[in-house]
Each structure stands twice: as structure tokens, then as C-alpha cells.
A protein has these predicted regions:
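ABC ATP-binding cassette signature C-motif
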Residues: 1-3, 13-255
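Alpha-helical coiled-coil heptad-repeat register
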Residues: 5, 252, 259, 263-266, ...
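Alpha-helical coupling/stalk and coiled-coil linker elements that connect catalytic or binding modules
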Residues: 17-27, 266-278
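Residue-level recognition of alpha-helical structural elements
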Residues: 130, 258, 276-278
Length: 278
């Protein structure tokens, strides 16, 4: 079933202020970690991504973000991280909540770092159990490399896995993954799936791998390219996609009936118009 969207008054900034849970009486207290309120965003005047979109995400939720190619899924991630700001409306995250997302490339100045140094740079303070944590996240992406190996000596696929593992190591409160299985073989996908199934914080994933998504997600955010809003659904991936497909079919049938009704009325009007003119 579709989850209700929030309808709240617009503001004009990205904030990390504590949420006003009194507005969310239909949810468990303290359960919401991220909320979009009447958010609108577009790159150009005639290409809107969002129009007054409203949705909220609970703590520990594991969700899939879907939408047509070019609808703006990666843009949603940039709005969540604060790389982009909404033109109107507001985006709230729970006070103190951290956000993690895998970088697309390793910064040039870090290529001379060792694997250990690269992971250490993700923390503001020295982490004494880092070796254990590195092993844990490298296992999550099915990668085995010496911790003293230079990043510059890794293959392109190994670097991609290092970047993914680096997003996991800080255990962010909101983990954003954009096509995380692209550089993984099946064993790597299995390892990542197992890691995410045990991940006890919020995770939002963009992926075309339906089997991967169906294993661990329990809800869908659907970015509608026509209404430029986000609809929320609860259920496993296959069930939700089937529900959305059925909904689209019902809407198409309804539109077809309406079109037929309009055409029938036009025929009657034309008939009586011609008859009256004789």
C-alpha cells in the first residue's frame, strides 16, 4: 500500500535542525530521520525534477529509489547530501545524523596513499581498531588487498570497490548507494547483500539489479517523471514494482475510457449540430 505523503508549509533551506515530531502524529515518535517538505528543484525552467515533493524516511529503513532514466534519481541524492539546495521547500535531517555516499573517483592527491591511509582519512580522529574495520568492509565488497598497497597500484575495478567500502566504513546514519553492484561479480553482490541485510541504519539504493534489491529492501521511493513528485510504497521490491505496474495499467484504462467518452460526446454533438442545421 502507498504511504501517505506529508503536507507541510514550505521553507527555503537545507537544515539539520531537530525534527518537529508533533507534526508526525501518525508515525512512531522519533522514527523519522529525513524529510522533504514541499521541495521543488529544476536545472532549467522547462526541466523540473521535483515540484512541491513531500516524503519522509524512517530510521533503519532500507529503500529503493526508482524512476525513469533521466528522471533525476542522482539529483535526489545530491539534495539529500546538501550538494544541491532546493529552490523552494525544505529538507530536514535528524539532528546529528551523518550521511555517507560512495565517491565516483579517488581524488588525485590520494592516489599515493595506502589502503590503510585512505580509510583512516575518513575519520577525524585516529581509529585504533581500523584494521579490523577495513577487513570487514573489504569483505563486504569481496576484495582482498594488502592494507599497505598504494591506491595507484590498484586496478580500476579494485578502486571502485575501495570507494564503495569507504562509504561503508564510517557506518553513516543515512547510507546512499548509487548502482553499487556495477563493479561487483556475483560473489561480491552476495557479500554486499549480506552486509546490507545486517546494516542497522538507514539505506537508500539506486540500482537496476532487481534480485539484489529484493533481498534486503522493504520499501520503494518512486520518482514520477510526469508529476515530479515522489510516491512511497511499503513492501519488497518485486511486489511494489508489480503494484506500480498495475496502477499504471489502471490509469491507462481509465484514460482510455475518458478519451472514448469524449469522442462519443463529440460524435453526438456533431450529429445533432448537422441535424439541426437541415
Amino acid at each position: 500500500m502507498r504511504r501517505a505523503a506529508l503536507a507541510l508549509s514550505p521553507q527555503s533551506s537545507y537544515t539539520s535542525e531537530p525534527l518537529d515530531f508533533s507534526l508526525l502524529s501518525f508515525m512512531d515518535h522519533g522514527d523519522v530521520i529525513l524529510r522533504f517538505s514541499d521541495v521543488s528543484f529544476s536545472y532549467t525552467h522547462n526541466k523540473p525534477i521535483l515540484k512541491e515533493a513531500n516524503f519522509s524516511i524512517r530510521e533503519k529503513a532500507k529503500l529503493t529509489l526508482i524512476g525513469q532514466n533521466g528522471a533525476g534519481k542522482s539529483t535526489i541524492f545530491k539534495l539529500i547530501t546538501g550538494v544541491l539546495s532546493p529552490q523552494s521547500g525544505s529538507i530536514h535531517k535528524r539532528h546529528g545524523a551523518t550521511i555517507g555516499i560512495a565517491k565516483q573517483v579517488i581524488p588525485h592527491h590520494e592516489l599515493d596513499c595506502s589502503v590503510h591511509q585512505f580509510f583512516q582519512s575518513s575519520f577525524t580522529e585516529k581509529k585504533y581498531d581500523l584494521t579490523r574495520d577495513i577487513d570487514r568492509v573489504l569483505d563486504a565488497v569481496n576484495l582482498s588487498v594488502p592494507h599497505d598497497k598504494l591506491l595507484n597500484d590498484l586496478s580500476g575495478g579494485q578502486k571502485a570497490r575501495i570507494l564503495l567500502a569507504n562509504a561503508l566504513i564510517t557506518e553513516p546514519d543515512i547510507l546512499l548507494l548509487d548502482e553499487p553492484t556495477n563493479n561487483l561479480d556475483q560473489q561480491g553482490i552476495d557479500h554486499l547483500t549480506s552486509f546490507l541485510m545486517g546494516y542497522e541504519k538507514t539505506c537508500i539504493v539506486i540500482s537496476h539489479d532487481s534480485a539484489f534489491l529484493n533481498c534486503f529492501t522493504h520499501g520503494v521511493l518512486n520518482l514520477d517523471a510526469f508529476t515530479h513528485t515522489i510516491q512511497q510504497y511499503v513492501g519488497d521490491y518485486y511486489d511494489v514494482v508489480a503494484e506500480i505496474a498495475a496502477q499504471i495499467e489502471r490509469e491507462q484504462q481509465q484514460n482510455a475510457r475518458m478519451e472514448k467518452s469524449i469522442q462519443d460526446r463529440k460524435v453526438k454533438i456533431n450529429f445533432f449540430s448537422h441535424k439541426g442545421g437541415k
